[in-house]
Curated annotation (Swiss-Prot):
Catalytic activity: 2 H2O2 = O2 + 2 H2O
Species per Swiss-Prot/TrEMBL record: Capsicum annuum
Top-level enzyme category: oxidoreductase
GO molecular function: catalase activity; heme binding; metal ion binding
Binding, heme: 348
Name of the protein in its database record: Catalase
GO biological process: hydrogen peroxide catabolic process; response to oxidative stress
Residues of the active site: 65, 138
Tissue expression remark: In stems, leaves, roots and developing fruits.
Keyword Iron: yes
Swiss-Prot/TrEMBL cofactor(s): heme
Annotated EC: 1.11.1.6
Subcellular location: Cytoplasm, Cytosol; Peroxisome matrix
Pfam family membership, one: Catalase-rel
Name of the coding gene: CAT
């Protein structure tokens, strides 16, 4: 008997029903009872196994990005950037790398409507020859807070009230009134882009600054941008209500049906490049995640294209168990000093261990598609076959050795050990610039959203005044229009 042939896979299904241990099941409808009326006997092993498996089917949902959909495809380099990075998957035009991509909403539960106003996740896992590279981003280029110390509170404020389980504006406005840097993200959150028509018609951003390093060890800061070839489309509030009431999975269905029909979604990848020597030349901190880089000074440079041409085979195995981690990088790519990114490196791996288990990287959807070797061993649900006698390094009995060193950016850091904010906060300028770039009807929708939120009966006069002050500092006319509709005067 070829024992390796029958590893767990639907490819080796038997023609008849069996237990988990492979024993035949001749009746899948009736429990084993004493007579036709019962009682049920505990010795009905298949009944117990079936029920026990059923009640353990679900794993903890993601604390954020619980609602999502995935698809597979490839990334192809279209423009040479080998002068910027030694990353193998970016080595030359024409190089293709298999990927899996997951789109999601951020705040709400796994079964919530995909039409709800929310930031969308846009995460791409590149299965490169040098290991996995996870670019874990969103459909907006900034985030609410620049320091991860506030991240748990940020998500709790956005999530439903723990008493009533209802999302309420007064909670959101109360918390973020203490974070003036959040206004720039609200200029996206309350804008049309947080009601995307579907996943195919939205942009993606790496959000954080990263570093690309070339063979000579020269590093540049970069930001990643995904641009959909079919354009960006959004819904109005009324359209979102109608779509959500018709089909709460409309974006998942659109993605799945489009790929099945051969209408493959495609995005172009662009980068912005900044020389580290230029970081202090701006009136904001370029490593502040609440800021964007000006495209007139740092223009978008084309890199490649992402094509999703294959639907996943199993939603649970390749969406629910799919695990991303910003800590997964490859030679030629490195982190920046962005405070939020630095913390995500730990938090994402930790949440996957809690959600899926300590050996989540052994799952096929998460495992690298290249040869790999380490001495991380055993643990719950370990299913990796190992027959080594040496489980330590270094050893004269094991030929494994450390990998050849690849370039990483050198950095000399000095400073006091302290808890503090960055010196160049500049919290309102970019929010105002974004507002002024819109057509009048788009500005009006943004103002209406603020009026709706600030009209929450539990939003106090103090909270309203703070937000009108923030809006006025971003754009005086915007703050005045919101104030006039609320009959609240700005307090500057």
């Amino acid at each position: 008997m070829d024992l390796s042939k029958y590893r767990p896979s639907s490819a080796y299904d038997s023609p008849f029903l069996t237990t988990n241990a492979g024993g035949p099941v001749y009746n899948n409808v009736s429990s084993l009872t004493v007579g036709p009326r019962g009682p049920v006997l505990l010795e009905d092993y298949h009944l117990i196994e079936k029920l026990a498996t059923f009640v353990r089917e679900r794993i903890p949902e993601r604390v954020v990005h619980a609602r999502g959909a995935s698809a597979k495809g490839f990334f192809e380099v279209t423009h040479d950037i080998s002068h910027l990075t030694c990353a193998d998957f970016l080595r030359a035009p024409g190089v293709q790398t298999p990927v899996i991509c997951r789109f999601s909403t951020v705040v709400h539960e796994r079964g919530s409507p995909e039409s709800i106003r929310d930031i969308r996740g846009f995460a791409v896992k590149f299965y490169t020859r040098e290991g996995n590279f996870d670019l874990v981003g969103n459909n907006v280029p900034v985030f609410f807070n620049r320091d991860a110390k506030s991240f748990p509170d940020t998500i709790r404020a956005l999530k439903p009230n723990p008493k009533s389980h209802i999302q309420e504006n007064w909670r959101i406005l109360d918390f973020f009134s203490f974070l003036p840097e959040s206004l720039h993200t609200f200029a996206f959150f309350y804008d049309d882009v947080c009601l995307p028509t579907d996943y195919r018609h939205m942009e993606g951003f790496g959000v954080h600054a990263y570093q690309l390093i070339n063979k000579a060890g020269k590093a540049h800061y970069v930001k990643f941008h995904w641009k959909p070839t079919c354009g960006v489309k959004s819904m109005t509030e009324e359209e979102a209500i109608r779509v959500g009431g018709t089909n709460h999975s409309h974006a998942t269905k659109d993605l799945y049906d489009s790929i099945a029909a051969g209408n493959y979604p495609e995005w172009k990848l662009f980068i912005q490049i900044m020389n580290p020597e230029d970081v202090d030349k701006f009136d904001f901190d370029p490593l502040d995640v609440t800021k964007t880089w000006p495209e007139d000074i740092l223009p978008l440079m084309p890199v490649g294209r992402l094509v999703l041409n294959r639907n996943i085979d199993n939603f649970f195995a390749e969406n629910e168990q799919l695990a991303f981690n910003p800590g997964h990088i490859v030679p030629g790519v490195y982190y920046s000093e962005d405070k939020l990114l630095q913390t995500r490196i730990f938090a994402y791996a930790d949440t996957q261990r809690h959600r899926i288990g300590p050996n989540y990287m052994q799952l096929p959807v998460n495992a690298p598609k290249c040869a790999h070797h380490n001495n991380h061993r055993d643990g719950a649900m370990n299913f990796m076959h190992r027959d080594e006698e040496v489980d330590y390094l270094p050893s004269r009995f094991d030929p494994c050795r450390p990998a050849e060193q690849y370039p990483i950016p050198s950095c000399v850091l000095t400073g006091r050990r302290e808890k503090c904010v960055i010196p160049k906060e500049n919290n309102f300028k970019q929010a105002g610039e974004r507002y002024r770039s819109w057509a009048p009807d788009r500005q009006d929708r943004y103002i209406n959203k603020w009026v709706e939120s600030l009209s929450d009966p539990r939003a106090t006069h103090e909270i309203r005044s703070i937000w009108i002050s923030y809006l006025s500092q971003a754009d005086k006319s915007c703050g005045q229009k919101v104030a006039s509709r609320l009959t609240v005067k700005p307090t500057m």
